[in-house]
């Protein structure tokens, strides 16, 4: 019996075509924390340096050491002031400091009942509205995404999940256990990773799951080769760790829709 196989190919403006890299020369803004900071915390080259080398991306770096998601609103506003019309894509790479700061997860929406015209008749329907604010992690993401969506309606936004957390000590009053431990409100880092994944659907943004796809796992000593210091800092990737992050991103960008 002869079998017929139907192949359906979706043709779009993918970012690698004809052997040419369509990301070359594109300006990409990077919002985030120490892993994005241009001062190179724990490394001499960040993931965005490697993306520049691999794909020819022009980096616009706004990440600041220690910043939580609530601080990225200020980074986004600075981006808007400095590059109102010439940024091609935006990366958001944060959340690990929100976990460390014991930030409650919160809710995306608050729900009410409102009367509205439906098919010519006034009916009472449930209605949801975004919860904004700095008190919760979801509220902080809503704050940030509102600014980004209103300021950059045409630019793709990429949400990166935090990498796994290893042990780190930066002094007697700044000792951070590894991710085997919940924070002081009982939440593991996984919960913050999951919220960022949810945000992709809530805000129509592309999620790149660096937590999974980078392969970085600082809970094991064998992964010390990818981190700043085996004894004192298994939190910040070194150059080798950043290159793995960059490659995980590059794999996704090579097959994504062009900015």
Residue ranges and their predicted role:
Residues 72-74:
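Short gly/ser/thr-rich secondary-structure transition/capping motifs
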Residues 1-4:
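Positively charged n-region of N-terminal signal peptides that target proteins for export
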């Amino acid at each position: 019996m002869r079998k017929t196989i139907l192949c359906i190919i979706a043709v779009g403006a993918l970012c690698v075509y004809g052997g040419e890299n369509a990301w070359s020369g594109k300006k990409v803004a990077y919002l985030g924390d120490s892993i994005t900071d241009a001062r190179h915390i724990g490394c001499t080259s960040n993931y965005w340096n490697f993306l520049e080398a691999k794909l020819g991306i022009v980096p616009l770096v706004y990440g600041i050491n220690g910043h939580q998601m609530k601080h990225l609103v200020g980074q986004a506003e600075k981006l808007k002031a400095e590059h109102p019309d010439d940024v091609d894509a935006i990366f958001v790479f944060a959340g690990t400091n929100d976990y460390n700061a014991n930030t409650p997860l919160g809710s995306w929406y608050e729900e009410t009942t409102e009367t509205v015209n439906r098919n010519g008749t006034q009916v009472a329907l449930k209605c949801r509205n975004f919860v904004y604010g700095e008190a919760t992690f979801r509220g902080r993401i809503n704050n940030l995404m509102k600014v980004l969506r209103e300021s950059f309606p045409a630019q793709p936004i990429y949400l990166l999940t935090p990498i796994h957390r290893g042990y780190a000590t930066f002094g007697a009053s700044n000792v951070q256990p590894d991710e085997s431990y919940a924070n002081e409100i009982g939440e593991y880092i996984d919960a913050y990773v999951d919220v960022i994944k949810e945000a992709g659907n809530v805000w129509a943004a592309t999620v790149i799951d660096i937590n999974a796809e980078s392969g970085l796992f600082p809970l094991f000593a064998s992964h010390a080769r990818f981190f700043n210091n085996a004894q004192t800092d298994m939190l910040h990737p070194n150059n080798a760790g950043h290159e793995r992050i960059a490659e995980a991103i590059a794999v996704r960008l090579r097959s994504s829709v062009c900015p």
